[in-house]
Amino acid sequence: MSKVSKAYREAAAKVDRDNKYTPLQAAKLAKATSSKNYDATIDVAIRLGVDPRKADQLVRGTVALPNGTGKDVRVVVFAEGPNATAAEEAGADFVGSAELIEKIQGGWTDFDAAIATPDQMAKVGRVARVLGPRGLMPNPKTGTVTTDVAKAVSEIKGGKISFRVDKASNLHALIGKASFDEKKLAENYGALIDELLRIKPSSSKGKYIKKVTLSSTNGPGVPVDETIQKNYADDAEA
């Protein structure tokens, strides 16, 4: 445990907490302060100026990261007949209907995303209490309730991520791996910010993007200049 603490302290010492870095600089620092023992995930935490208790300020959506996530995403598809065949051909990891529902009711949640055809949603509703809290419940707003299951599978496998603000007005998302080039991480970060700006609730007053932090798995947080909202991969000084 002391080795972990020492490694963390050494990593944290590289980050100036009083500075706000450009997205490119932050990505470079997040990589530099990541574990050398494995390919760490790079995540972004964003504090939004919204009140999630108000339905019209519950920010949620999806975005296709231009450089993917670097993660092998396990996808479940609730479908039958030709739709099930299409899902399998598109590369879905698990495809089925009632048998998958029963498996989930038994405690199985070994997957990262779930897609369903509209006719399956009555059945999927039986496991809403399991899938919902984990962010796995199919939803038309995120494109995961659809008749075009092949497209949905391909998008998720290709780097499409879902995001949702929590009760404390924070939003967390994966933007890549430490093995990514920092410009690719900055581009992925920019795609997320652009989408958040696009769907900003009209009822949200004051500053919308209030605070941004990048970090690797178990690494220190790197403050990002939240006012930078274009040219995310530019190599400019903060």
Swiss-Prot record:
Keywords for this protein: Repressor, Ribonucleoprotein, Ribosomal protein, RNA-binding, rRNA-binding, Translation regulation, tRNA-binding
Entry keyword Ribosomal protein: yes
Keyword Nucleus: no
Span of the signal peptide: none
Gene Ontology CC annotation, any one: large ribosomal subunit
GO biological process terms held by the UniProt record: regulation of translation; translation
Molecular-function GO terms, alphabetical: rRNA binding; structural constituent of ribosome; tRNA binding
Region annotation (Disordered) ranges: 217-238
Residue runs in coiled coils: none
Family indicated by similarity: Belongs to the universal ribosomal protein uL1 family.
Protein role: Binds directly to 23S rRNA. The L1 stalk is quite mobile in the ribosome, and is involved in E site tRNA release. Protein L1 is also a translational repressor protein, it controls the translation of the L11 operon by binding to its mRNA.
Subunit structure comment from the entry: Part of the 50S ribosomal subunit.
Protein name (Swiss-Prot/TrEMBL): Large ribosomal subunit protein uL1
Organism: Corynebacterium urealyticum (strain ATCC 43042 / DSM 7109)
